[in-house]
């Protein structure tokens, strides 16, 4: 249920900072601000959508909590389409907490996670897919994932979905008139006409679904794991790719005993890359635990980067690792090529029996760009960019479009089987309902709760 009260929350991340923001939204937002804000003008005289210097004061005892900049925004030209006040204060958590507690004491309620965005949806400011784009934008890790979220926030996907749903509803209305009111002087709709129209809609929906795998990778990224024997250069590779000295690099085998991970940007693709403990037979209890974690990381990974030491060559440990990987997406690096001659590298490549390999010297930076290009080519055909096209990035949307397509196909099969149009309309109604769940035109309270619970406080 929509609670028509006034909410408040800290909208900036927790921790010390130069500036912190408290957001208030609802019918009592201005009333609360008037009681606690002391500026050059009376609060009622402050124009909407202006920033005003003043102090936050406890009205009970006159104690000053902080010097602030306050923004007053009158409905409906606000994010929530309610009266909104934003208080920009100093960023210490004590100051923020004290001002928030004062707002609550004066009549606001602590907002639930995502409640500001939920109110924007419920008040018609954005639709449900645009609301989901807000969290995608907050969580984006590359320029391309940010662009994809902004495209969805601007309503590009919504317009396509609403257009398809609107055409289905028009067809349903035409079918209803034809079936229920044959005496009316309206052009009769036939099964062939319905078949042709829903076929066009299905084609457009299929085009959107085709973009999902690419969109998913841009939004969610790839989980990649670096594996190989101890001291093959895994930690050095992680440090080289991330540009940080995150992993300890020594000549002692088995130095990395736990999982180390880093988020990096590879040609526009968010990559969560994991450095693992070297895989070998060992009696060391701690190292054994690390090896077990490595096996779990491999199972969950989208991509495995296997490193082979060119100086030591291939051995049973390497063969055992290759066998264990099965049909996992795999890139093999022959590392430390600066320490060996061409003959030794060729011998390793012949033992790998035609598997694609990249020759690298992580120490010298050789082969790193080839690795980055290989990762891109393995997951995305062509350039990783978000231009004017619609990119489907959300699995919830993809599943609902798939169900809409399935319902349309059932309707087409029914028409092929000469079923009456009033029965055909059942599947068309289902298709329209599935599309409505994407934009929020037909969605349950449980689904809304699930979506908005993923937001943090203040959003």
Curated annotation (Swiss-Prot):
Signal peptide: none
Localization in the cell: Cytoplasm
Record's GO cellular component terms: cytosol
Cofactor: K(+)
Binding residue positions for K(+): 231, 250, 252, 255
A Pfam family matched in the record: TrmE_N
EC class: hydrolase
InterPro entries: G_TrmE, GTP-bd, GTP-bd_TrmE_N, GTPase_MnmE, MnmE_dom2, MnmE_helical, P-loop_NTPase, Small_GTP-bd
GO terms assigned for molecular function: GTP binding; GTPase activity; metal ion binding
Ligand binding ((6S)-5-formyl-5,6,7,8-tetrahydrofolate): 23, 86, 125, 459
Binding site for Mg(2+): 235, 256
Family membership: Belongs to the TRAFAC class TrmE-Era-EngA-EngB-Septin-like GTPase superfamily. TrmE GTPase family.
Subunit-level organization: Homodimer. Heterotetramer of two MnmE and two MnmG subunits.
Protein name: tRNA modification GTPase MnmE
């Amino acid at each position: 249920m929509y609670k028509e009260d006034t909410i408040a929350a800290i909208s900036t991340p927790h921790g010390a900072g130069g500036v912190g923001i408290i957001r208030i939204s609802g019918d009592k937002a201005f009333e609360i601000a008037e009681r606690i804000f002391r500026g050059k003008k009376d609060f009622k005289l402050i124009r909407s959508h202006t920033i005003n210097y003043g102090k936050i004061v406890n009205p009970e005892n006159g104690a000053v909590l902080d010097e602030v900049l306050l923004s007053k925004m009158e409905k409906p030209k606000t994010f929530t389409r309610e009266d909104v006040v934003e208080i920009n204060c100093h960023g210490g958590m004590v100051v923020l907490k004290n001002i928030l507690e004062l707002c609550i004491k004066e009549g606001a309620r602590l907002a639930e996670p995502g409640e500001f965005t939920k109110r924007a949806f419920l008040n018609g400011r954005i639709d449900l897919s645009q609301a989901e784009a807000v969290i995608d934008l907050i969580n984006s890790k590359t320029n391309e994932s940010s662009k994809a979220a902004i495209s969805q926030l601007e309503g590009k996907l919504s317009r396509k979905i609403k257009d398809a749903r609107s055409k289905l509803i028009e067809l349903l209305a035409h079918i209803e008139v034809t079936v229920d009111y044959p005496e009316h002087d309206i052009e009769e709709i036939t099964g062939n006409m319905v078949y042709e129209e829903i076929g066009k809609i299905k084609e457009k929906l299929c085009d959107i679904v085709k973009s999902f795998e690419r969109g998913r990778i841009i939004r969610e990224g790839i989980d990649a794991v670096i594996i190989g024997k101890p001291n093959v250069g895994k930690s050095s590779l992680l440090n080289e790719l991330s540009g940080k000295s995150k992993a300890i690099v020594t000549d002692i085998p088995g130095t990395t005993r736990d999982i180390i991970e880093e988020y990096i940007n590879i040609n526009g693709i968010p990559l969560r890359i994991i450095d693992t403990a070297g895989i070998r037979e060992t009696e060391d209890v701690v190292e054994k635990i690390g090896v077990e974690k490595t096996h779990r990381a491999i199972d969950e990974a989208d991509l495995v980067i296997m490193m082979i030491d060119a100086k030591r060559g291939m051995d049973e440990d390497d063969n055992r690792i290759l066998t264990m990987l099965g049909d996992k997406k795999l890139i093999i690096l022959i590392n430390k090529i600066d320490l060996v001659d061409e003959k030794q590298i060729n011998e390793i490549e012949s033992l790998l029996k035609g598997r694609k390999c990249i020759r690298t010297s992580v120490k010298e930076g050789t082969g790193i760009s080839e690795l980055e290009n290989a990762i891109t080519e393995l997951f995305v055909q062509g350039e990783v960019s978000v231009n004017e096209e619609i990119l489907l990035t959300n699995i919830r949307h993809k599943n609902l479009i798939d169900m809409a397509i399935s319902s349309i196909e059932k309707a087409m099969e029914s028409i092929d089987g000469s079923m009456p149009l009033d029965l055909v309309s059942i599947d068309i109604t289902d298709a329209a309902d599935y599309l409505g769940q994407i934009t929020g035109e037909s969605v349950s309270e449980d689904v809304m709760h699930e979506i908005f619970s993923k937001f943090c406080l203040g959003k």
